[in-house]
Amino acid sequence: EITTRLVGSEMCIRDSPKEQYQAFRRTTLKMRGELEQSQLGAELAAQEQVLCIVNRRKTAQELYNNLPKEGSYCLTTLLYPAHRKQLLQKIRERLKDGLPCRVISTSLIEAGVDVDFPAVYREEAGLDSILQAAGRCNREGRRPAEQSLVQIFTLEGQHVPRMLEQNVSATQSVLKKYADLASPEAIETYFLFYRTLKGDKRLDEQQILQGFEQDMEGRIFPFATAAERFRLIETPAVTVYIPQGKGEHLLARLRAGEVSKTLFRQLGQYGVPVYPDHLKTLENAGAVCQISEGIWELTDGSLYDNNTGLAMEAETGAAWFA
């Protein structure tokens, strides 16, 4: 096992980079290697407050389904945004009150979500994602770094999702060169490795490396910005709208022929992104209908669970594993 300290999601580099860097060492990184999903689930269930971030929405649902229901939550984009906001509020309240709070999430919780867990598990991903995950552990610096573990793992029998292969490869290259993954040099090297693997053009379109070139000698280390720009490189998905809460009324207006930016902006709070194979599964099960070109509505309410969101499987027996 390899152990090294991590910093939070943002680093201020001012007159004395080394001193400022030391001030942000709040967690300890532990490389766990391969775990069986049942073993991971048992470890999570044994902890009172813990965050586990995985790469697949289906994995998140499976892990959640094997946890004690009291104080356990599943956060993925299979929950529409308004629903996620409600759950996040409950999560923050339980963390604040010291109540049991076990959260299984995909990477969405790494993007600007202000939560503070005493322990974090992160499935193997790019260094940008690992450091963002670390920013959700001991965020307020109230616990010793040695007691604030960020554990990196792979799951037995699961390969790295294709869209993350180059990120993971770049991280592994950095691990061979640097003991401290959170050092500014390691992070810059990570993005340089990624640029080499991906090709300059794709990264230059998002101006990721330019940000490092401008700010490595400046005041703010642009890590959060770079991570967010990485997320702009997306995979194709369509939106299925869920007729729950205000979403039901908004969809009725859409079906009646109303079309406006305001309506679609409001509807966005009730949309779930699905990939083509997942949409096909829902179509084959007769669970969705197309209101108009590219606009889908869930018609089988039994496929939306109040805890885990839109089902990955329907009565056809097919499934989408992303």
Each predicted region: which residue ranges?
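Glycine-rich phosphate-binding "P-loop"
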Residues: 16-37
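Conserved catalytic network of the ASCE P-loop NTPase/AAA+ motor domain
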Residues: 4, 45, 94-98, 112
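Single conserved hydrophobic/aromatic residue that forms the stacking wall/gate
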Residues: 2-13
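Conserved beta-strand scaffold positions in the cores of enzyme catalytic domains, especially
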Residues: 14, 26-29, 72-74, 120, ...
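C-terminal helicase lobe and adjacent C-terminal extensions/tails of nucleic-acid helicase motors
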Residues: 39-47, 53, 58, 62-68, ...
